[in-house]
Amino acid sequence: MGQKIHPHGLRLGITSEWRSRWYADKQYADYLAEDIKIRDFLSEGLDRAGIANVVIERTHDRVRVDIHTARPGIVIGRRGSEADRIRGQLEKLTGKQVQLNILEVKNIDANAQLVAQSIAEQLTNRVAFRRAMRKAIQGAMRQPQVKGIKVVCSGRLGGAEMGRTERYHEGRVPLHTLRAEIDYGTYEAHTTFGRIGVKVWIYKGDVVGGRRESLMNARDERPSRGRRERPRRGGARRQRAEQKQEG
């Protein structure tokens, strides 16, 4: 089941959190339909902004929308004009007061949704699919919190007559382990040969006792501002001579 089910849905309440945070009794269906419309509007209107996640919170008369994006300048616009336009459209869509928060995603290579979108954009620009997949894998594995990544592309790859699926992975991606923090993202590339689907799984370590291994690794592996020590050069003869002098 771990190979087929959505990694976020399988781990809700364990390693992943809900992306819609509100409670409703009789209005549940209306609120859910509104959430779907909000997400569709943002994904279609801000496809160039690199949206990684949209979190929606509701109160009785207010809707709070948190947009996690790699390019906040596109979402905000000049002097906040684009953000005001988006807020107005969302208020017209929901009929309620909307609080819009725009949050920047700093580590792009460790976010599965942004990695999938990057691969899809390269495929749209006629970059070879193998090169795009390998470049994404190399960029992700350089991050200290990433322990494994799997990338899948499906469609008429390279303009072939028959569609097929290509898979590349590096490191560990334990989809059956519930305590594993798995980030998952999908995107579609619209090419001249048709649509190509891109799926990305990124493993960032385990979550034990509420502590995320990915956060601990990111803190430990921060580069120091001081000068790095160069490795000493020399063969076995020099090492033996130094050992004799010490002895």
Curated annotation (Swiss-Prot):
MF term (GO), any: rRNA binding
Entry coiled-coil feature ranges: none
Keyword Kinase: no
Keyword Ribosomal protein: yes
Compositional bias ranges of the Basic residues kind: 227-238
Domain of life of the source: Bacteria
Pfam family, one: KH_2
Key words, A-Z: Ribonucleoprotein, Ribosomal protein, RNA-binding, rRNA-binding
Gene source species: Corynebacterium jeikeium (strain K411)
Start-end of Basic and acidic residues biased regions: 214-226
One GO cellular component term: cytosolic small ribosomal subunit
Family: Belongs to the universal ribosomal protein uS3 family.
Function of the molecule: Binds the lower part of the 30S subunit head. Binds mRNA in the 70S ribosome, positioning it for translation.
Lineage, broadest ranks: Bacteria, Bacillati, Actinomycetota, Actinomycetes, Mycobacteriales
Subunit structure: Part of the 30S ribosomal subunit. Forms a tight complex with proteins S10 and S14.
Region (Disordered): 214-247
Domain KH type-2: 38-106
InterPro entries, per database record: KH_dom (IPR004087), KH_dom-like_a/b (IPR015946), KH_dom_type_2 (IPR004044), KH_sf_prok-type (IPR009019), Ribosomal_S3_C_sf (IPR036419), Ribosomal_uS3_bac-typ (IPR005704), Ribosomal_uS3_C (IPR001351), Ribosomal_uS3_CS (IPR018280)
SUPFAM superfamilies per record: Prokaryotic type KH domain (KH-domain type II), Ribosomal protein S3 C-terminal domain
Name of the protein in question: Small ribosomal subunit protein uS3
GO biological process terms held by the UniProt record: translation
NCBIfam families: rpsC_bact
